[in-house]
Amino acid sequence: MGQKVHPNGIRLGITKPWISTWYADKSDYASNLNSDWEVRKFLVEKLQAASVSKIVIERPAKSIRVTIHTARPGVVIGKKGEDVEVLRAAVSKLAGTPAQINIAEIRKPELDAKLVADSIAQQLERRVMFRRAMKRAVQNAMRIGAQGIKVQVSGRLGGAEIARDEWYREGRVPLHTLRADIDYSTSESHTQYGVIGVKVWIFKGEVLDGMLPQIEEPKQQQPKRKPRGK
């Protein structure tokens, strides 16, 4: 069977940036990596209702800067910024360094693979039919401006005895094209029949930045043929 490489991992440094951007010596690398994992785990559990897509961590000058990408910034910030201050203190304690929290709003959650996958998973937990949830997500993404989307669910769909997977695709999803901007993410739905896995691929277009501009060569005009007999 053919296996698929992770769409985000293969594009790191080409069209996708890393979600942890810092440099450390050998002595500090392991502790920083573990600290990143602890911070992400804490924030994901704390902000389950905030529609968090990703958490980007930077470490400038013996401090930590966390950028939370969310579709509901008001839930993260809280009344008069009180919740952000609580998060900042907790992150600073976990990392052991001064912390700064930034909030980035996601304007189009229908085009974010993580948010789409979480939405489908939540609908499955509310006993919405999986085909309806998949089709609704695909239609919303294409309506907002996606060039292609694929959604796959796996598990005991509809309470069936035998687990299976079903997928639905619309538009193009070119996984082999490295310049293709493909957002990929997964989620899990915990139902009474077991865990159902959700995968989402969203193709937003091709990234051409950094490539040399293609200049079309002027077409050479062919000389006009003289009419016969002259």
Curated annotation (Swiss-Prot):
UniProt-listed SMART domains: KH (SM00322)
InterPro entries: KH_dom, KH_dom-like_a/b, KH_dom_type_2, KH_sf_prok-type, Ribosomal_S3_C_sf, Ribosomal_uS3_bac-typ, Ribosomal_uS3_C, Ribosomal_uS3_CS
Keyword line: Ribonucleoprotein, Ribosomal protein, RNA-binding, rRNA-binding
Domain KH type-2: 39-107
A Gene Ontology BP annotation from the UniProt entry: translation
Pfam families found in the cross-reference section: KH_2, Ribosomal_S3_C
Molecular-function GO term, any one: rRNA binding
GO annotations of cellular component type: cytosolic small ribosomal subunit
Complexes and interactors: Part of the 30S ribosomal subunit. Forms a tight complex with proteins S10 and S14.
Similarity annotation: Belongs to the universal ribosomal protein uS3 family.
PANTHER family, per the entry: 30S/40S RIBOSOMAL PROTEIN S3, SMALL RIBOSOMAL SUBUNIT PROTEIN US3C
Role of this protein: Binds the lower part of the 30S subunit head. Binds mRNA in the 70S ribosome, positioning it for translation.
Protein name (database record): Small ribosomal subunit protein uS3
Name of the gene encoding the protein in the UniProt record: rpsC
